Regions:
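Phosphate-binding loop and its immediate beta->loop->alpha context
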Residues: 6-138, 142, 224-308, 312
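Short glycine/serine/threonine-rich phosphate/pyrophosphate-binding segments
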Residues: 180-185, 408
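Short beta-strand scaffold segments in enzyme catalytic cores
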Residues: 1-3, 25-28, 183-187
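N-terminal phosphate-binding loop and flanking beta/alpha elements of the actin-like ATPase fold
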Residues: 1-19, 49-174, 188-210, 215, ...
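Helical "lid/coupling" subdomains associated with nucleotide-phosphate turnover
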Residues: 194, 218-234, 254-422
Length: 422
């Protein structure tokens, strides 16, 4: 939030007894039966959605990654407890709650928004699809009560935050690593640029790819966790030895919010049969415990913890332990080395590196022309990601800071610049 005096204040959100400056774009819907027998449903967003989901014994419907579907015309919405909800309507619910929280904290109406957007939305294969995604996002914000909605590229917003620390002009490369996208911008920033006013030619170029932290997490699940749950296990079927469990079940494990879709009678029968026939039944039993306990969120918290620890040291141990009433408890302890993790994400790293290559070539800029590389977002902590940039630009030119909030701060500064307040 841009304050009247020009300062920036971040909204805080309650989560498990703490106040945090970030809000995940998730929704959780639960249903219950009234005394009269009627079915009622209620929805929650952000940290409260995660809290309600974790506390619920009978899990409702958890929805996330909505922005990743904005460019897809075929995906108009989803059905929740028998009612059809448009995609824009679901995003409006999140944005409305954000706006309400901001008004409560800052004590004044919030009617203008500068919204961050990726360079290229996930799944967008043309400018038309990209603009379609923007139009849907704009509709959601307007329906949430905002009277004026402007958009800024997320890496450009991060550049605004970095620029506030400068005492001279620089040509900078911004790398913004989110959950679903990695975005890059090349632009000139600094005090003189602010004084003379920004020009279109100050932004030399943008590129983006639809992968980042979530893709890295999925690799850890596929290569480390799923084998411990039987993905490579075999089973006897008549005179044949076949995979114990269909591969598509493990694909659902790679995205924690998909795991709840496995809690069906069909999957239960598949897993029950697999456990009986499997050569490693204990692994299938562990998989059953995770599916029946709907432990996808907890599992991925352990995955992210292991990824974080591998950013700090060469080796760690992936640990996951949970006990579910009426179901066998599960405990996984798997050693993992950074070198293994880096081998799993080799193709992803190559895609990111290629995106930076394209940006430099299309902008006519050589690596030695770049004064500074500013990396933001949680995935920027991954050593293999940072090496892509230190190898090309030198460690002395790599900088980070406020990795989880720099885009939000930059959006406020972008709004101020657009309004002529600076």
């Amino acid at each position: 939030m841009l304050q009247p005096g020009g300062g920036i204040e971040l909204a805080n959100f309650a989560f498990r007894g703490e106040a945090i400056p970030v809000c995940r774009s998730v929704l959780y819907f639960e249903q219950w039966q009234t005394a009269s027998g009627q079915r009622r449903a209620h929805g929650y967003s952000g940290p409260q959605a995660i809290e309600r989901y974790l506390e619920a014994e009978d899990k409702g419907r958890l929805i996330q990654s909505l922005k990743s579907h904005l460019s897809q015309r075929a995906l108009t919405g989803t059905e929740i407890f028998g009612r059809r909800h448009r995609l824009e309507e679901l995003i409006t619910r999140i944005v409305s709650d954000l706006r309400k929280r901001a008004e409560e904290q800052f004590g004044r109406p919030v009617v203008r928004a500068t919204v961050g957007r990726p360079v290229r939305f996930v799944g967008a294969e043309s400018e038309e699809e990209d603009e379609f995604a923007v139009s849907r996002l704009r509709e959601a914000f307007l329906d949430a009560g905002f009277e004026e909605v402007n958009f800024e590229l997320e890496p450009v917003a991060a550049a605004y935050a970095y620029e506030a620390t400068l005492d001279r002009d620089e040509l900078i490369l911004i790398g913004d690593f989110g959950g679903g996208t990695s975005d890059f911008s090349l632009l000139r920033v600094g005090p003189e640029v602010r004084r003379r006013g920004r020009k279109p030619e100050d932004l030399l170029g943008n590129t983006g790819v639809g992968l980042a932290g979530d893709a890295f997490d999925a690799r850890i699940v596929r290569k480390l966790v799923s084998p411990a749950l039987g993905s490579n296990s075999e089973a006897r079927s008549l005179n044949k030895i076949l995979p114990a469990v269909p591969a598509w079940i493990y694909a659902h494990l790679e995205h924690w919010h998909y795991l709840s879709f496995l809690r069906t009678n069909n999957v239960r029968e598949i897993l029950k049969s697999a456990k009986i026939r499997a050569l490693e039944p204990e692994k299938i039993e562990a998989l059953i415990a995770i599916v029946e306990g709907d432990l996808g969120y907890q599992l991925h918290q352990s995955v992210q913890k292991a990824k974080y620890e591998l950013s700090k040291r060469e080796r760690t141990e992936f640990t996951f332990r949970d006990g579910i009433a009426g179901i066998s408890s599960i405990e996984l302890r798997i050693p993992v080395a950074r070198i293994d993790f880096e081998s799993w994400i080799t193709e992803d790293l190559a895609t990111i590196e290629h995106s930076v290559d394209v940006l430099l070539r299309s902008s006519g800029v050589k690596p030695h022309d770049v004064d500074r590389v500013f990396l933001t977002g949680g995935t920027s902590f991954v050593p293999a990601v940072r090496r892509l940039f230190t190898k090309r630009f030198g460690p002395e030119r790599i900088q980070g800071g406020d990795e989880f909030t720099s885009v939000a701060q930059g959006l406020a500064l972008s709004s101020a610049a657009a309004a002529g307040k600076k």
